[in-house]
Amino acid sequence: MLAFSTYTYAQKYYTKNGFISFHSNTSLEKIEAENNQVTSVLDTKTGDLQFSLPIRGFRFKKSLMEEHFNENYLESDKFPKAQFKGVITNWTGINLQADGKYPVKVSGQLSMHGKTQEVQISGTLLIAAGKITGQSTFTVKLADYQIEVPRLVKNNISETIEIRVNCLYDHSL
């Protein structure tokens, strides 16, 4: 049984300090925030991939933006986390024994603000010296997650937000 547990453990890669940022660009304002509190697990046997991050983990350059983001838009007291559960659909084409850059397609469910959507995301896995780095850039429509922007600032915030992901995975926690 111990041998089985060790074998299963070795197939999972983890990060507790992954990076996710978002960007909203309009002609009136550029809004950016970063979150380094991203937890993720990659199962190298199946290609299953999970992410979880605290909404309050996003940091803004302006504290007032951070306050509005948490209280008015994402309602982080009511919806404290964003999560993704999915699978790398082209996992069988990834060779973990060979350093390189591998394009990946990820399919799964993205949940935030109390809503869940099916998403298809493209990304890259970088394999180097036994480490895996996952990277992706994709967009999210605020309306898909019923995130409402007050009319007063509607022109300041893009309806589509760019999300960037960068996670360095390791065997150990």
PLM segments and residue spans:
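Bacterial Sec-dependent N-terminal signal peptides
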Residues: 1-13
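Low-complexity, acidic/polar, glycine-enriched regions of mature
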Residues: 10-173
